[in-house]
């Protein structure tokens, strides 16, 4: 086989016998390909192991024949736009290895995973609370209510919740996990759904309010955003109780 043919071979499923034969090949190009192949296989193995470890909390419920939903939020800190939450129920067949804390993933990776999560999950729902609600009841309570909204919108009722460091005001057993989106695939999937959903909302708002850069900053207080606030003032989606937006209402 040529080096090029071997390179193509190693991109697919390779048997131990084929690897053993390649190890006997004295060509330096072949040995370099094998070194690269082993590194990739090691990385893939470690990725699979980490993925399986993130089912630790889900398994506690699956073993009892119960469904558990992961719940997470995005958008607590921005000066503009809603807080968005997601509730996601997955089962033992869920196999999207790239699912992880949404903050660790590129926007492109999140966009690719979003439809796959919707397809593979048992049930997915989203909760949204806008700037007016946030200003009325504070961001923490708005966050909790949005989480409850997402859980109640699931078309299948879960037996319990895994939540990223929050308590959801619903009558269900809950496990609160600090940095839960890095410890549970259910919460990680919810973090991706919430993030992509909110980013799409902010892209839409960017078309309505083009001066603030919402499609780039998602409502966070970047220099571009603050400069636009100073020049144009706050919009309908700005949070009046968040500084420096609140300065415009004194």
Curated annotation (Swiss-Prot):
- Please name the GO terms that the record assigns under molecular function: manganese ion binding; RNA binding; RNA-DNA hybrid ribonuclease activity
Task: Say what the protein does.
Answer: Endonuclease that specifically degrades the RNA of RNA-DNA hybrids.
* Name of the gene: rnhB
Q: PANTHER family given for it?
A: RIBONUCLEASE H2 SUBUNIT A, RIBONUCLEASE HII
User: In its UniProt record, which GO terms are filed under biological process?
Assistant: DNA replication, removal of RNA primer; mismatch repair
Q: What is this protein called?
A: Ribonuclease HII
Question: Per UniProt, which keywords does this protein have?
Answer: Cytoplasm, Endonuclease, Hydrolase, Manganese, Metal-binding, Nuclease
As to how many cofactors bind and how, the note says: Manganese or magnesium. Binds 1 divalent metal ion per monomer in the absence of substrate. May bind a second metal ion after substrate binding.
Q: What is its main location?
A: cytoplasm
Please give the GO cellular component terms listed in this UniProt entry.
cytoplasm; ribonuclease H2 complex
């Amino acid at each position: 086989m040529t080096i090029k043919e071997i390179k193509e071979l190693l991109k697919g499923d390779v048997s131990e016998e084929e690897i053993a034969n390649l190890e006997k090949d004295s060509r330096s190009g072949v040995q370099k390909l094998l070194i690269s192949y082993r590194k990739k296989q090691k990385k893939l193995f470690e990725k699979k192991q980490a993925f399986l470890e993130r089912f630790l909390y889900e398994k506690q419920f699956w073993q009892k024949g119960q469904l558990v939903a992961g719940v997470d939020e995005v958008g607590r800190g921005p000066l503009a736009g809603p807080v968005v939450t997601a509730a996601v129920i997955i089962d033992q067949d869920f196999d999207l290895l790239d699912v992880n804390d949404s903050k660790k993933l590129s926007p492109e990776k999140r966009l690719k995973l979003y439809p796959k999560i919707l397809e593979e999950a048992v049930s997915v729902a989203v909760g949204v609370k806008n700037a007016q609600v946030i200003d009325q009841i504070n961001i923490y309570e708005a966050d909790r209510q949005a989480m409850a909204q997402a859980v109640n919108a699931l078309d299948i009722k879960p037996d319990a919740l895994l939540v990223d460091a929050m308590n959801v005001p619903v009558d269900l057993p809950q496990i609160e996990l600090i940095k839960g989106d890095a410890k549970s695939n259910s919460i990680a999937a919810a973090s991706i759904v919430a993030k992509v959903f909110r980013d799409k909302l902010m892209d839409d708002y960017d078309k309505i309010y083009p001066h603030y850069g919402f499609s780039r900053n998602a409502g966070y207080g970047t220099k571009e955003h603050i400069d636009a606030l100073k020049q144009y003032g706050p919009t309908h989606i700005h949070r009046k109780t968040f500084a420096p937006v609140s300065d415009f209402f004194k």
